[in-house]
Each structure stands twice: as structure tokens, then as C-alpha cells.
Regions:
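Structural motif
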Residues: 125-134
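Generic structural signal for helix capping and beta-alpha/helix-loop junctions
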Residues: 69, 105-107, 130, 163, ...
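Residue-level detector of anion-binding/catalytic polar loops
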Residues: 58, 119, 186
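Non-catalytic C-terminal accessory region of glycerolipid acyltransferases
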Residues: 2, 6, 133-259
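Membrane-anchoring hydrophobic helices of lipid-metabolizing enzymes
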Residues: 1-72, 85
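Hydrophobic alpha-helical segments of integral membrane proteins
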Residues: 43-51, 55, 109-112, 135, ...
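Catalytic core of membrane glycerolipid acyltransferases/transacylases, capturing the structured
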Residues: 22-30, 70-126
Length: 259
């Protein structure tokens, strides 16, 4: 059960703002010193660990063997604003997230995600598709030599966080699966459970708890032979949704509390 209080707000909000401000300033300093983008992402990973510790949120991960070391699209069900810190903690590569353009206007936070190269999602579907396609093309061309971090394009295919207390997923947007097919990028499905209990949609105070991340077996566009590009993207969409839904069911069965 969620327990929000003035005491929690007075403790959490200043701490979060301090961490975000410090991280942003450190990253800007790294840019001045011409640090590599990989080193800057390392800074973001460290910041994420501090944030999770501050909020008393634990991340439990299974299926790490399914996190392939090649450019890919990560698809996860969207439960909470904690999904991004959870993935940054789980995925040690260079994760590029999509964020609504409004988030880039938030003081301190917006500048921070811009520096990290987060992708601006527009209300115009055609413009968003073009931006995502360019991002997919960019990570596909990344050379993984000299210990470079593996790039992943992280997308929440529902497009918005769920409000359903039973974690029922919303409709998946097909556009990203067309992009996966176009650029022949594998999809790594991740099922996530627990974020909604820490901070539901619309809330900005956090309860302590655990987020369970289950990395599932990747799906490869080239495995769908003998069908049109449109049919291939539809099959990829349906199979990704089923895989995440099945994984989510397993997490709920293993970790939900009675009542």
C-alpha cells in the first residue's frame, strides 16, 4: 500500500533536485573536458544508483543472458517514471530513451536528458517516426571496438504509463516494429513489475519497494521470412507483446502480495 506524506516529500524532493543538478553540472564539465559519450553515460549510471539508494528502491533482474551485445531495440511495458532509472541500472550499455518533448522544458531535468542524447518525441507521428528511424540507423552503424558501450534504443511501446493496478498493458504502437524491420534490429523484450506500486501515474512522491525486471529472449526480424514487410512488423509486434505479457504474468505470480 502506498504511503505518501509531507515528511517523505520534504526528504525526497530536495535530494532528487540536488542529485539531478549535480549530475547535470558534472556532465557539462565532462563535455568541456571532451570526455567521450560512453564516459558520460557511465556518469549517468552512477547517478542512477545514487537516486535509487536515496529513494530506497531496489532493482532485481533476471535473464541477463538475453541482453545481447549488439545494437538492438529494447521494448518494455511502461509502469512508472522509475522505468528509466531501472533500465539504466539494468542495462550497462548506452541506452537512448524516447521522451515527450514537454519533458525537455523542465528546469534542470530537461537540460540533463538533452545532454544525454535522449530522443524528443513529437505529437506528430510522422515526425516521431523520422526521428526514431534516424536513431535506429545511428545505433546500427555503431562500431563496437575498443570496449565501446553497446547502444540500445529503449522504447515503451504503449506510449504512456499504465494506470491499471493489475499492470494490464495498453495497445502497442506499430511504428517502432516497422523501424526494427527496416533497419533489421533485434528486439529485446523486458517485462517490468513493481514500479506502479512505488509511484503510480500522476504521483511525484515515492514509496520504497522493489522493481523486478525480466529480460526475455530477443526477437529477430530476419526470422520472419516469406511475408511482406507490413506482415513482418505486425507479427513482430504481436510476438513482442505476447512475450512481455507472459513474462509479466510470471513476475506477478512470483512477487505479488496477497490482497
Amino acid at each position: 500500500m502506498l504511503k505518501f506524506s509531507l515528511k517523505s516529500a520534504l526528504y525526497q524532493v530536495p535530494g532528487i533536485m540536488f542529485l539531478i543538478s549535480r549530475c547535470r553540472l558534472q556532465i557539462e564539465y565532462d563535455l568541456i573536458r571532451n570526455k567521450s559519450h560512453d564516459e558520460i553515460f557511465g556518469r549517468a549510471h552512477n547517478f542512477t544508483k545514487q537516486l535509487l539508494k536515496l529513494l530506497n528502491v531496489k532493482i532485481e533482474v533476471s535473464g541477463l543472458e538475453n541482453l545481447i551485445n549488439k545494437p538492438a531495440i529494447i521494448c518494455q511495458n511502461h509502469t512508472s517514471i522509475m522505468d528509466i532509472p531501472a533500465i539504466l541500472n539494468t542495462v550497462k550499455g548506452k541506452s537512448l530513451f524516447c521522451a515527450k518533448i514537454e519533458l525537455f522544458r523542465i528546469w534542470v531535468f530537461g537540460k540533463g536528458i538533452e545532454i544525454l542524447g535522449m530522443i524528443k518525441v513529437h505529437k506528430d507521428d510522422k515526425k516521431t517516426w523520422k526521428v526514431l528511424s534516424e536513431a535506429a540507423k545511428k545505433i546500427k552503424a555503431t562500431k563496437l571496438d575498443n570496449g565501446a558501450l553497446t547502444p540500445y534504443l529503449v522504447i515503451f511501446p504503449e506510449g504512456t504509463r499504465t494506470k491499471d493496478k493489475d499492470y494490464k498493458m495498453g495497445e502497442f504502437k506499430r511504428g517502432l516494429f516497422s523501424i526494427a524491420v527496416k533497419h533489421n534490429l533485434p528486439i529485446i523484450p523486458i517485462a517490468s513489475y513493481g514500479g506502479l506500486d512505488i509511484t503510480p501515474k500522476g504521483a511525484w512522491i515515492f514509496s520504497k519497494g522493489t522493481i523486478h525486471e525480466k529480460i526475455l529472449e530477443p526477437l529477430y526480424p530476419e526470422d520472419y521470412e516469406g511475408v511482406s514487410i507490413k506482415e513482418k512488423s505486425i507479427k513482430l509486434q504481436n510476438d513482442t507483446r505476447k512475450r512481455i505479457n507472459d513474462g509479466l504474468g510470471e513476475l506477478i505470480k512470483a512477487h505479488s502480495r496477497p490482497g
